[in-house]
């Protein structure tokens, strides 16, 4: 059952998951010291999640799976952050989901959207594990036996970061939409806490415009072929 749901969500998550994020902005935000503290703490957690995704994508030998919106893998990636956690990208996503929830402190998001996110990613992970076990068999079993599913094994992480080259170009090409989304959500959440007059909203609007402009610029460079991820070694 979870595998079936996971395969469905793997195809449709880009359309469905953003709808859940809308619950972050339901209701009215009360400005208080507690709200500011929650915003700062939540932003830190969300940015940690984004940093996890950036490290995952930027380290050499790491290629994200998926073909034609179906679970797919050419090879079993066991290096980079995947040597410490089987699902570092999803770990990053979950940290971002938690961080947004802490920052917003919104009961609609915390009570409805966040549990749905957790269930959705549990199903997607189940679908991917089912596929990888069928494709790679014992190799995947051994990988699972020594590598945690989500909570990373920190032993040896420093050596991994030192010995693997980091590809910033790949990060920009592969991660710009997620980074743009993270910045937009945090700007909007901060606006609900800090904005009190037209000048504040003008500043927020300018930050949103610049973020979208940067995202559009990267997209155009990518589509034109002037910006690419470079070779995977």
Residue ranges with predicted function:
Residues 1-82, 95-233:
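Membrane-anchoring alpha-helices and their flanking helix-loop junctions
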Residues 85-86:
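Conserved SAM-binding loop
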Residues 90-94:
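Conserved beta-strand->loop/alpha-helix structural units within folded catalytic cores of enzymes
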């Amino acid at each position: 059952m979870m595998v079936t749901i996971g395969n469905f969500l793997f195809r449709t998550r880009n359309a469905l998951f953003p709808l859940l994020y809308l619950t972050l902005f339901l209701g009215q935000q009360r400005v208080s010291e507690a709200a500011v503290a929650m915003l700062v703490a939540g932003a830190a957690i969300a940015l940690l999640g984004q940093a996890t995704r950036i490290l995952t994508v930027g380290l050499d030998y790491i290629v994200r799976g998926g073909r034609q919106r179906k679970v797919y893998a050419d090879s079993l990636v066991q290096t980079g952050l995947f040597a410490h956690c089987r699902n570092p990208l999803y770990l990053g996503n979950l940290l971002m989901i938690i961080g947004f929830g802490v920052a917003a402190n919104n009961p609609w998001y915390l009570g409805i959207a966040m549990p749905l996110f957790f269930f959705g990613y549990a199903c997607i992970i189940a679908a991917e594990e089912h596929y990888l076990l069928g494709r790679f068999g014992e190799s995947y079993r051994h990988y699972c036996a020594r590598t945690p599913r989500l909570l990373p094994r920190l032993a040896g992480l420093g050596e991994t970061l030192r010995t693997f080259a980091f590809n910033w170009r790949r990060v920009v090409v592969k991660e710009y939409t997620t980074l743009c989304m993270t910045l937009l959500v945090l700007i909007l959440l901060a606006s609900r806490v800090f904005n009190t007059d037209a000048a504040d909203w003008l500043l927020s609007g300018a930050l949103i415009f610049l973020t979208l402009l940067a995202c559009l610029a990267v997209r155009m460079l990518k589509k034109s072929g002037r910006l690419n991820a470079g070779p995977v070694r």
